[in-house]
From Swiss-Prot:
Belongs to the chibby family. 'Chibby' is Japanese for 'small'; the gene was so named for the RNAi phenotype seen in flies. Residues 1-10 have a biased composition (Basic and acidic residues). The gene is CBY3. Plays a key role in the correct positioning of the annulus, a septin-based ring structure in the sperm flagellum, serving both as a physical barrier and a membrane diffusion barrier that separates the midpiece (MP) from the principal piece (PP). This positioning is essential for proper sperm motility and function. CBY3 interacts with CIBAR1 to form a complex which localizes to the curved membrane region of the flagellar pocket. By doing so, may provide stability and rigidity to the periannular membrane to prevent membrane deformation. Residues 172-186 are annotated as: Leucine-zipper. One of its GO terms (cellular component) is sperm annulus. Changing G117A: Reduced interaction with CIBAR1. It is found in: Cell projection, Cilium, Flagellum. GO terms for biological process: spermatogenesis. This is Sperm annulus positionning complex subunit Chibby3. InterPro entries: Chibby_fam.
Length: 242
């Protein structure tokens, strides 16, 4: 393959080259300097056209890279704010209402133990149609155990009933005292209200009470006069009948 003319070395023959030399054919009658400048222009023209394209591509890549980095940073900040930076503050449960509580919490320890305490029974066993109970380190029949436990059970039941009666009587006494206090307060309020009402009536109508008293006196006088006239009318009739 033949090499192109652009890559062949040029011999240094000075300013003048003899006719028939290779340089005379390559120059084709053009000066040496003009040929070199034209060659430089032809070589520099493609690079000058490629530079703006490369700059534009680099700027586009930088913009896309910065936008992608900013998106990643925003996503990381949002994740940090949602999951890590917030303090742990769980929601408080709703408050328990008093009516939902059982009334056994108001009782004393002994009553609660008697009502809600666990009562484990003694181990039992049955042999040949007879029941045995292990209590006090020995096996006893159920009939003997019933005889021995009957007074104990009666005492404990009586004591528990007496305690319940005491607590009930105490509650009733407190309720009675509270009702008495309310009754006295209502009576005082009623008395004060009646006194205010009479005072307002006197201030608004001061002549009502005297007129009412006068009317009552007139009625009494009329009754007395009617009674005396009736007596006088009866006397002549009585004399005629006699």
């Amino acid at each position: 393959m033949w090499a192109s003319r652009d890559h062949l070395p040029e011999p240094d023959l000075g300013d003048a080259a003899p006719p028939g030399s290779p340089s005379s054919f390559w120059t084709s009658g053009l000066p040496r300097q003009e040929r070199s400048t034209s060659r430089q222009r032809s070589r520099g023209s493609p690079s000058s056209t490629c530079v703006p394209y490369k700059v534009h591509a680099l700027a586009t890549f930088e913009c896309s890279a910065t936008s992608h980095a900013s998106r990643l940073w925003q996503t990381l900040q949002q994740f940090w704010a949602d999951h890590i930076s917030r303090p742990f503050s769980p929601r408080r449960p709703p408050l328990r209402r008093m009516p939902s509580l059982s009334t056994f919490y108001l009782l004393d320890h002994n009553t609660r133990q008697a009502e809600l305490g666990l009562a484990y029974g003694a181990p039992c066993m049955r042999l040949s149609n007879q029941a045995f109970v292990f209590r006090g380190g020995r096996w006893t029949t159920e009939s003997q155990l019933a005889r021995t436990r009957s007074p104990l059970l009666s005492r404990t039941a009586w004591g528990w009933k007496a305690q319940v009666q005491r607590s009930k009587s105490q509650v009733l006494l407190e309720e009675n005292n509270y009702l008495k206090l309310q009754q006295e307060l209502l009576i005082d309020m009623l008395t004060e209200t009646m006194a205010r009402m009479h005072l307002l009536e006197k201030q608004r109508n001061p002549e009502v009470i005297p007129t009412a008293a006068a009317r009552a006196g007139q009625r009494k006088m009329r009754k007395r006069a009617g009674a005396s006239a009736g007596v006088l009318m009866i006397q002549p009739c009585a004399l005629d009948s006699q």
